[in-house]
Amino acid sequence: MELTPLIRDKSRLSDFLKDIPNDPGCYLMKDGEDRLLYVGKSKKLRNRVRSYFRSGNELSPRISLMVRQVADIELIVTDNESEALTLESNLIKSHQPYFNVLLKDDKKYPYVCITWGDKYPRIFLTRKRRQRQLKDKYYGPYVDVYLLRQTLFSIKKLFPLRQRRIPLYKDRTCLNYSIGRCPGVCQEEISSEDYKNTLKRVEMIFQGRTDELRILLEKQMISFSESLKFEEAGSVRDQLKGIDRLYESQKMIIPDSSVCRDIIAMASEENISSVQIFQMRSGKLIGRLGYFSDNSNFNSSQILQQVIENHYSNVDPVEIPSEILVQHQLVNNILISDWLSEIKKQKVNINVPKRSRKAEIIKLVEKNANLELQRIKQSQDKNLVELDDLTNILDLENIPKRIECYDISHIQGSDAVASQVVFIDGIAARQHYRRYKIKSPNIKIGHSDDFESMAEVITRRFRRWARFKEEGGDIDALLSNESSVLDNLNLNDWPDLVVIDGGKGQLSSVVAALEGLKLDQNLNVISLAKKKEEVFIPKVKQSLVTESNQPGMLLLRRLRDEAHRFAITFHRQKRSQRMKRSQLNEIPGLGPQRIKLLLEHFRSIEAIQMATFSELSSTPGLGRSTAVVIRNYFHPDKNI
């Protein structure tokens, strides 16, 4: 049974608030469907939780929206505030509650990921964390992308590591093994344990433990030399030289090179803050990490503390430095210091330098944070100009925050697909992209109908909203956040503007589909024709008068081109799969199920063609007789 939000159930709220203990601990706020919205901690739970529901207490719009959805609050009492901090950090890390996300990793900043859950882990750059892969280890986010790529490239030259996600050949190693770049993991030429030991040494570089790594490699080199294994000793020597080259350009910028420090500073402007972390190890700058934060309801001390809690809860204890220099005094400086010391099992000091060389370093980090802030502000300003101009072109009431664009791709009706791309605040939001296979039986090889295809896609996209309205739901109230069911109904993806790639015909078919859904009065929809870059709006014959180079048109073209790229990529993928299947369809005795098994097992026609008889016959669900037919089809001169 779904619970009613507490603010609409005064009796239940009053009873709950009376019984809250005034002990330290954590509180977990949940919605009506028991989804976790927010995790918080407090030295006095009663005072903190009551503050959310106290009349006259001015809450930020974000927190106010959250409180309207809270239907249940779970309390966990701890012995002290330090335990509450540790528990809060673990809960946020495990559940990633929506309203806890104060920090935003800029998607331009990449991480280094090591997939420790794999038998032979990979190491690669990524801009997105894989939430379901709990054994993955991430380092970053790094600000200097070019330097990071160069570092990883050099590391893969120094240490033989897995180079490919999918093996190039099924039955033999590739050239990377022959030239010493890969230890032959595809054929298991190296044990998983030995390979992971190599990767642990690479991990030490990203942990800032290069001094330890040097000592380890020097001992190994001496051991190889004493055992007369001169080739192995030479390989380790090359690794040592390579590690030195990685950091030879770094300057000694702190007097005491024996101390490991992280320096954290920020720059703020309007409602956004840029936060930078400089990682100093043995006097060398080994990494620059960056975050962006919404600072509309938080002061500098709160943001810096949130950075520290967020960052150090995601690293191994060995990566926590003995000293952290911060730009401003933290809200709970002693508490955070004790928390980090407990994790590291060694004293961690958090200091605010006022003078001397340390203060100069803080100024340097602040300067870099400000440069990143100006970069992101320039991008936002450009997007705002484009969105504002588009609003004027289309005579919209408000600037469109979420814009969706749709395109159809096919060749004479074959492999017909559609794309949905989404721009939020003028920036591509790839996590919201969708692809559609056209299901209409009328669309087939030799017969295409872009109008019908587009109508089908729009109908499928908005049928949840149509059902909500048919059941008596008020879309306008929902979108204005006057209803607490916004997330509960999973109706949080309403676009402010829909753009159709096409002319008046495509637009008319979409409008007809929306009329059938009874959504035509709620949705802003336009089309952009390719030939003359004309913009059409519903029920108006003539295109709008625009200039090709005005900002709003540039945004529309960028959106349209992205939709076209996404659609044609999916179409080519589907066509390639069909062509593979069509070749296998020519083999007697192979039905759809066995073709699917073959492609899943061997991944390509080429691999099936090169497979030996024993490999084919051992494929699950195939059998010896079918393996004979396949082998004879591809190698008629060597009939079995």
Curated annotation (Swiss-Prot):
Keywords: Cytoplasm, DNA damage, DNA excision, DNA repair, Excision nuclease, SOS response. GO terms for biological process: nucleotide-excision repair; SOS response. Gene3D superfamilies: 5' to 3' exonuclease, C-terminal subdomain, GIY-YIG endonuclease, UvrC, RNAse H endonuclease domain. Residues 211-246 form the UVR domain. GO terms for molecular function: DNA binding; excinuclease ABC activity. It holds the Pfam family UvrC_RNaseH. The keyword DNA damage applies. Its main location: cytoplasm. SMART domains: GIYc, HhH1. It is found in: Cytoplasm. It comes from the Bacteria. GO terms for cellular component: cytoplasm; excinuclease repair complex. The UvrABC repair system catalyzes the recognition and processing of DNA lesions. UvrC both incises the 5' and 3' sides of the lesion. The N-terminal half is responsible for the 3' incision and the C-terminal half is responsible for the 5' incision. PANTHER family: UVRABC SYSTEM PROTEIN C, UVRC/OXIDOREDUCTASE. NCBIfam families: PRK00558.1-5 (NF001824), uvrC (TIGR00194). Belongs to the UvrC family. Interacts with UvrB in an incision complex. This is UvrABC system protein C. It comes from Prochlorococcus marinus (strain NATL2A). The lineage of its organism: Bacteria, Bacillati, Cyanobacteriota, Cyanophyceae, Synechococcales.
